[in-house]
């Protein structure tokens, strides 16, 4: 009888399941809707997981009544012990044929396990931002990830908000803008389709949509690429804020992570990283300064990586490892390095 291992990438918008053979071959995949239990509740979350795994089983030519050997789930909110325990109980009680064993981890743990064998830093900058350190022993610590009301520094939302605020404060004569506001002001009116600042208030309060507001970041990026000094300045500052998140976790990093040939592996997740060239100056500045204070001797360099495979792959590998089976992983195909730096 065929032995299968499964992995789930549980996102806030979309989810993915991969089924693997014992020798690490991907046999089937299935896509689905959000499986974030904070957004949709535990019941719907486990139903969607069961439905996706069964769909993948059928694609792999396996009877849905034959349980997987192990299922690893990489879920946002997978670090809340009570919620994880409840999810496990629901999966076992309601769907006894789904899998023989389960491991639920954070989305960051699944991501890094897809990219490297020993852990590293996951630095997320999409609509929001977050930084998670996963040490070789599986222990985690982090900085950020508290949402737009408390932070999300360096994210698309933060960049959009900075741009809008600099324009408002400059017109009010509250704070002088570091550069001419002309481009950003006009881009702001065009993007939100309003004639003046009062029109923007609708988008900030009555009709507030975080993703839509964060989307203005794209217009700031376009300005920066065209050479607008204010847009470039905002992105440089965003790079600095993201770098400071890495500096914040330096004291917690197992020295082993500094010693590989790539230096500290930093996995970059989220669409803001598409503008790496605009973030670069501020990012390097923050890490160079932070390193002098925090970890000068051991922190000699780093490599930025991006995933080429779903983090469901890393989740499957962690789920298998949890029951003593090592799935062969080809890290060179599952992640790609796009920037390396050695401190002088």
Curated annotation (Swiss-Prot):
N-acetyl-D-glucosamine binds at residues 36, 107, 129-130, 145-147, 152. Belongs to the eukaryotic-type N-acetylglucosamine kinase family. Keywords: ATP-binding, Immunity, Innate immunity, Kinase, Nucleotide-binding, Phosphoprotein, Transferase. Pathway: Amino-sugar metabolism; N-acetylneuraminate degradation. The gene is NAGK. Its EC number is 2.7.1.59, 2.7.1.-, 2.7.1.60. It comes from the Eukaryota. It catalyses: N-acetyl-D-glucosamine + ATP = N-acetyl-D-glucosamine 6-phosphate + ADP + H(+); aldehydo-N-acetyl-D-mannosamine + ATP = aldehydo-N-acetyl-D-mannosamine 6-phosphate + ADP + H(+); N-acetyl-D-muramoyl-L-alanyl-D-isoglutamine + ATP = 6-O-phospho-N-acetyl-D-muramoyl-L-alanyl-D-isoglutamine + ADP + H(+). ATP binds at residues 13, 127, 214, 271, 275. GO terms for molecular function: ATP binding; muramyl dipeptide kinase activity; N-acetylglucosamine kinase activity. This is N-acetyl-D-glucosamine kinase. The modification Phosphotyrosine is found at residue 205. It comes from Bos taurus (Bovine). InterPro entries: ATPase_BadF, ATPase_NBD, NAGK-like. Homodimer.
């Amino acid at each position: 009888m065929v032995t299968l291992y499964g992995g789930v990438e549980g996102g806030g918008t979309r989810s993915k399941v991969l089924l693997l053979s014992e020798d690490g071959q991907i046999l089937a995949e299935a896509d689905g809707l959000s499986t974030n239990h904070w957004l949709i509740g535990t019941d719907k979350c486990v139903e969607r997981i069961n439905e996706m795994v069964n769909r993948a089983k059928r694609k792999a030519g396996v009877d849905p009544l034959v349980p997987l050997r192990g299922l690893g789930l990489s879920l946002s909110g997978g670090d809340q012990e009570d919620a994880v325990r409840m999810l496990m109980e629901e999966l076992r009680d309601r769907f006894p044929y789904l899998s023989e064993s389960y491991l639920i981890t954070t989305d960051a743990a699944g991501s890094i396990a897809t990219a490297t064998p020993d852990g590293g830093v996951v630095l997320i900058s999409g609509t929001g931002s977050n930084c998670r350190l996963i040490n070789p022993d599986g222990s985690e610590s982090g900085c950020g990830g508290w949402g737009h009301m408390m932070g999300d520094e360096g994210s698309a939302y933060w960049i959009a908000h900075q741009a809008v605020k600099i324009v408002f404060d400059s017109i009010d004569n509250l704070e002088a803008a570091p550069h001419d506001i002309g481009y950003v002001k006009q881009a702001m009116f065009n993007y939100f389709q309003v004639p003046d600042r009062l029109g923007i208030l609708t988008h900030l309060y009555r009709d507030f949509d975080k993703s839509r507001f964060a989307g203005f970041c794209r217009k700031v990026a376009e300005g920066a690429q065209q050479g607008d000094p204010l847009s470039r300045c905002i992105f440089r500052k965003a790079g600095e804020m993201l770098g400071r998140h890495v500096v914040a976790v330096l004291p917690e990093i197992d020295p082993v992570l500094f010693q590989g040939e790539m230096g500290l592996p930093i996995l970059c997740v989220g669409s803001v990283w598409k503008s790496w060239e605009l973030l670069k100056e501020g990012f390097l500045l923050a890490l160079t300064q932070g390193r002098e204070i925090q970890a000068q001797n051991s922190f000699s360099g780093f490599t930025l990586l991006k995933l080429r495979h779903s983090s469901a792959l890393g989740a499957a590998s962690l789920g298998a490892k949890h029951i003593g089976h090592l799935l062969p992983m080809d890290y060179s195909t599952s992640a790609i390095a796009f920037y390396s730096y050695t401190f002088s």
